Amino acid sequence: MNTRLEKFYKENVVPALMKEFGYTNPMEVPKLVKVTLNMGVGEAATNKKILENAVADMAKISGQKPVVTKSRVSVASFKIRDGWPIGCKTTLRRAKMYEFLDRLINISLPRVRDFRGVSGRSFDGRGNFNMGVKEQIIFPEIDFDAVDAIRGMDIAITTTAKTDAEAKALLAAFKFPFRN
């Protein structure tokens, strides 16, 4: 079962990147490995309902059940103890990853207020891209009226690219809206 974006990758992106970077083998072309979603909910230490709502929101957005993350150390200034739940995360691979990216690029990011594109400087030096979303309501799966609080999330896109230039070319070929 190939998703729309996966089919686009095989038919359009691979030949374009082979030509641009001079690859001789299609297996050399960088590809997407995984997309990791992380939602830190610091208020979850005091109220369990907040964490349940965050987990439900992320499950709707990702299409799979997230894992609850727990604190590793006690921090008095944050009023948390070792082992307390403080957020949730999920990792998307294969078909769910392509479906999520398709929705992110074509539906969710254009719904962001005053959206001018994502920063092209958010690469880590090894071909991975990280971005943050300030509101979870940009995703079409979230019902605006049922939301108890506006929460942001981190999105990490992991690729097989060796350099940031290759990774940026890969995401740009997917029509990722870069600002610069």
Curated annotation (Swiss-Prot):
One of its GO terms (biological process) is translation. Pfam families: Ribosomal_L5, Ribosomal_L5_C. One of its GO terms (molecular function) is tRNA binding. It comes from the Bacteria. Belongs to the universal ribosomal protein uL5 family. HAMAP family: Ribosomal_uL5_B (MF_01333_B). This is one of the proteins that bind and probably mediate the attachment of the 5S RNA into the large ribosomal subunit, where it forms part of the central protuberance. In the 70S ribosome it contacts protein S13 of the 30S subunit (bridge B1b), connecting the 2 subunits; this bridge is implicated in subunit movement. Contacts the P site tRNA; the 5S rRNA and some of its associated proteins might help stabilize positioning of ribosome-bound tRNAs. This is Large ribosomal subunit protein uL5. It comes from Xanthomonas euvesicatoria pv. vesicatoria (strain 85-10) (Xanthomonas campestris pv. vesicatoria).
